[in-house]
Amino acid sequence: MAVKNYKPTSPGRRFVTFSDFSEITKVEPEKSLLEPIKKTGGRNAQGRLTVRHQGGGHKRMFRIIDFKRNKDGIPAKVASIEYDPNRSARIALLNYADGEKRYILAPVGLEVGVIVESGPDADIKVGNCLPLRNIPVGTMVHNIELYPGAGAQMVRSAGAAAQLMAKEGKYANLRLPSGEMRLVLQECRATIGQVGNLEHENVTIGKAGRSRHLGIRPTVRGKVMNPVDHPHGGGEGRNPIGRNPSTPWGKLAMGVKTRGNKKSDRLIVKRRNKK
């Protein structure tokens, strides 16, 4: 994959960059693995705004992704590499030997025609899924479970990979993309390799309309709102905030930790790197 740049033939083209989609081998998705998505506009069941900056965007269908990889011992052939509008990574369509079809995240190096499998006895090969206890130390992995059998929850975005650093007792020590060192049960499964679409981080949206197509609404500064809408709002003309920077709900915004304590904190060996 590469990033395409354009000559500035218009203001909208001046800064915009696109993926060249060279790795995509099939345009139409597998219909049996599609589900409709109902847009929420960031509202909950009561109709109240709970997530800002969401709404609009192009209509999408959800691709059902196999995050559990629980068809052990049955080989699958990669039929195609496809675009998924719901995530930054590409997805791969697998045709299993028993006739079933499933989507998985497409790692770097996975090509059409390659055979992949899952289970404790699978080979250490890109795209194969195994329990952490069966993966050699030092291997790069993605699509990692936090609880055995629950399905992968970590390291799923484009270009992401974690490294298996050590094994001790019933836990494996993983270095996550954030720099965090975390213990995960060795019975949890992970997929060998790095998530594909490596150049995703280098793509520039470039214009407001493209954000709207993606379902991202504008971010408005609190300073330009009215006092009823934001603690920073109001005043005559341009003026300072007049208080410590705050969220729209009045909580301190700069440098205040918002993460609550969890029982699983004991499994974090080292916190993530500071930005």
Curated annotation (Swiss-Prot):
Q: Does the keyword Kinase apply?
A: no
Biological function: One of the primary rRNA binding proteins. Required for association of the 30S and 50S subunits to form the 70S ribosome, for tRNA binding and peptide bond formation. It has been suggested to have peptidyltransferase activity; this is somewhat controversial. Makes several contacts with the 16S rRNA in the 70S ribosome.
Which key words are in the record? Ribonucleoprotein, Ribosomal protein, RNA-binding, rRNA-binding
Please give the Pfam families that the UniProt record associates with this protein: Ribosomal_L2, Ribosomal_L2_C
Protein name listed in UniProt? Large ribosomal subunit protein uL2
Give the residue ranges for region: Disordered. 222-275
Q: Which domain of life is it from?
A: Bacteria
- Which species does this protein come from? Desulforamulus reducens (strain ATCC BAA-1160 / DSM 100696 / MI-1)
Q: Which SMART domains match?
A: Ribosomal_L2 (SM01383), Ribosomal_L2_C (SM01382)
Keyword Ribosomal protein in annotation: yes
Which GO MF terms are attached to this record?
A: rRNA binding; structural constituent of ribosome; transferase activity
Q: GO biological process annotations for this chain's record?
A: cytoplasmic translation
Assembly, per entry: Part of the 50S ribosomal subunit. Forms a bridge to the 30S subunit in the 70S ribosome.
Q: Which family does it belong to?
A: Belongs to the universal ribosomal protein uL2 family.
GO terms for cellular component: large ribosomal subunit
Q: Which InterPro entries match?
A: NA-bd_OB-fold, Rib_uL2_dom2, Ribosomal_uL2, Ribosomal_uL2_bac/org-type, Ribosomal_uL2_C, Ribosomal_uL2_dom3, Ribosomal_uL2_RNA-bd_dom, Translation_prot_SH3-like_sf
